[in-house]
Every structure is written in structure tokens, then in C-alpha cells.
């Protein structure tokens, strides 16, 4: 018998039937072509996995009877906010997808000086919604049951004035390497765009309590740097191990 895993924004309760939301129903019915009796693992972001069976499946609505639930054990022990400068093409999308797989807690798209993307407020909102769907898909694939929030794009100066974290790190390929010491309760990780943050932005970050972090002698692309940084932090303080 086939089994699938899907996100639904609807409330989920054991021994109750749930009509899945439009996104989940469309994917299950039209892409995966589920049938009555197929097993599903459903999550809604509350940290639990809900198991059940499809009781009805039409082109527009899939319903599932939830029969059991258990807490997910896939969340990182680190509370990490990734502030990543927006980049052109699909590089930003790829980066946030992989960051989700690596356990990031939240994502903030940053509009720094060297970000070469100009959109209207309406298009930025659509971008934010699209990025959130990418994160949801990454959670479905990776087994996560808590969905990282993708914030509205914001300027670097605004984010720096608002962010709160025990450990604040900004990537800088010119920084002096230093060791990571005691495990923090929360981390804010700032990564610039192609070409890096402007010198004035690095200075502003340091003035707001950030420490420079260097990831080795090579210059990493803007979509590669988050993966390396999150892997280093996860191996040092989190649940990434060999």
C-alpha cells in the first residue's frame, strides 16, 4: 500500500476526518493520484506527524481520517535565523530549500546595497508567498514537522535594529578565523549577496553586536555559503554528526 507525506494548514485531530487544504488536495489528487485507502502522513507545523488513511479523493478535495499521531524528532536543537541577501534567478530559492533541510528556524530575505533585484510591493509579497511554499515542500521532503517562517523582505539596517539572538554572526571572507565556543540558545546568521556586503554594511553589522565568521580560504557563492555555514554550526552545536 502506498504512503505519502504532505503538509496541510488545517487543524488535525486523531479519530477525526480532515478535509485537506487546496494545496495538499491538488498535489495528492492530481500529481500523486492517491486513492481511497492510501496511507498518509500529514503535518500542519505544530511539531507532530499525523497518520491516517484517505477516505475520499476527488480532483478538488482529498479527505483523510487521522488515526494516530506522534511528535516529530527531526527538529534541530539550534534556534537559527538565516538572514540571506536576495539573489537573482533560482539561487535564493535553492539556498532556502537546502537551509530548511539543514534545520534553520526562520528565514529573512535581506535587501542589501548590492542586491540587484527591484520589484513592486505586490510582487515582493508574491515572492514571499512563493518562497514559503518552497520551504513547505522542503519540510515535506526532509521529514520536518515545524515549518520555518519566511519573513517579508526587509532592508539590512531595519533587520539589524530588530534582530535578537544570543550569537550573531556575519559571513566575511576577509575575517580572521576564530573558534566557536559555548553553545548559544539562539543564532542569527547574516549572509550577503553576490559580491558580498558593502564595507559600510559589515561595519554596521559589527556595531550591532555581530561577529565576523570566515568559512575557509575560498570565496563561496551566495547560495553555497548558507549550506556550509549551517553545516558548520550544526556540527559544532547542533545535531549534524558523522
Question: For the regions a protein language model found, what residue spans apply to each?
Answer:
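Glycine/charged-rich beta-loop-alpha catalytic/anionic-binding loops adjacent to active sites
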Residues: 18-20, 77-81, 186-188, 207-215
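N-terminal positively charged helical leader segments and presequences
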Residues: 1-71
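N-terminal small/glycine-rich loop or linker at the start of catalytic domains
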Residues: 3, 73-79, 180-183
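RNA substrate-binding interface of SAM-dependent RNA methyltransferases
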Residues: 67, 73-167
